[in-house]
């Protein structure tokens, strides 16, 4: 949501697709431990959907940062 105000200001009619990346790390033990040290947890799919709704995004997608295939497939539809 960091860029949301700027995007809405400069491109008010542009549809937004919110993308949750690094899906492959959601279940990664090292990543989970590092997040726990900061009192954080990975973002869940329902949390991503809620954020998309909050900012008025037309779609919420998740992908592995390694492939980004899901996002590309959706973008060309």
Curated annotation (Swiss-Prot):
InterPro entries: P-loop_NTPase, Small_GTPase, Small_GTPase_Rho. Its EC number is 3.6.5.2. Its main location: cytoplasm. It catalyses: GTP + H2O = GDP + phosphate + H(+). GO terms for biological process: actin filament organization; cell motility; neuron migration; positive regulation of bicellular tight junction assembly; positive regulation of protein phosphorylation; regulation of cell migration; small GTPase-mediated signal transduction. GO terms for cellular component: dendrite; lamellipodium; melanosome; membrane; nucleus; synapse. It is found in: Cytoplasm; Membrane; Melanosome; Cell projection, Lamellipodium. The keyword GTP-binding applies. GO terms for molecular function: G protein activity; GTP binding. Keywords: Cell projection, Cytoplasm, GTP-binding, Hydrolase, Isopeptide bond, Membrane, Nucleotide-binding, Nucleus, Synapse, Ubl conjugation. GTP binds at residues 22-24, 65-66. It is a peripheral membrane protein. Regulated by guanine nucleotide exchange factors (GEFs) which promote the exchange of bound GDP for free GTP, GTPase activating proteins (GAPs) which increase the GTP hydrolysis activity, and GDP dissociation inhibitors which inhibit the dissociation of the nucleotide from the GTPase. GTP hydrolysis is stimulated by ARHGAP30. The keyword Translocase does not apply. The N-terminus is blocked. GTP-bound active form is ubiquitinated by HACE1, leading to its degradation by the proteasome. Gene3D superfamilies: P-loop containing nucleotide triphosphate hydrolases. There is a cross-link at residue 53 (Glycyl lysine isopeptide (Lys-Gly) (interchain with G-Cter in ubiquitin)). The effector region mediates interaction with DEF6. Interacts with NISCH. Interacts with PIP5K1A. Interacts with the GTP-bound form of RAB7A. Interacts with SRGAP2. Interacts with CYFIP1/SRA-1. Interacts with PLXNB3. Interacts with ARHGDIA; the interaction is induced by SEMA5A, mediated through PLXNB3 and inactivates and stabilizes RAC1. Interacts (GTP-bound form preferentially) with PKN2 (via the REM repeats); the interaction stimulates autophosphorylation and phosphorylation of PKN2. Interacts with the GEF proteins PREX1, RASGRF2, FARP1, FARP2, DOCK1, DOCK2 and DOCK7, which promote the exchange between GDP and GTP, and therefore activate it. Belongs to the small GTPase superfamily. Rho family. Plasma membrane-associated small GTPase which cycles between active GTP-bound and inactive GDP-bound states. In its active state, binds to a variety of effector proteins to regulate cellular responses such as secretory processes, phagocytosis of apoptotic cells, epithelial cell polarization, neurons adhesion, migration and differentiation, and growth-factor induced formation of membrane ruffles. Rac1 p21/rho GDI heterodimer is the active component of the cytosolic factor sigma 1, which is involved in stimulation of the NADPH oxidase activity in macrophages. This is Ras-related C3 botulinum toxin substrate 1. The gene is RAC1.
């Amino acid at each position: 949501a960091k860029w949301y105000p700027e995007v809405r200001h400069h491109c008010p009619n542009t549809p937004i697709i919110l993308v949750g990346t690094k899906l492959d790390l959601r279940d990664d033990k090292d990543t989970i431990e590092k997040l726990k040290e900061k009192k954080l947890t990975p973002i869940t799919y329902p949390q991503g959907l809620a954020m998309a709704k909050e900012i008025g995004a037309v779609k919420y997608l998740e992908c592995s940062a390694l492939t980004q295939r899901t996002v590309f497939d959706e973008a060309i539809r």
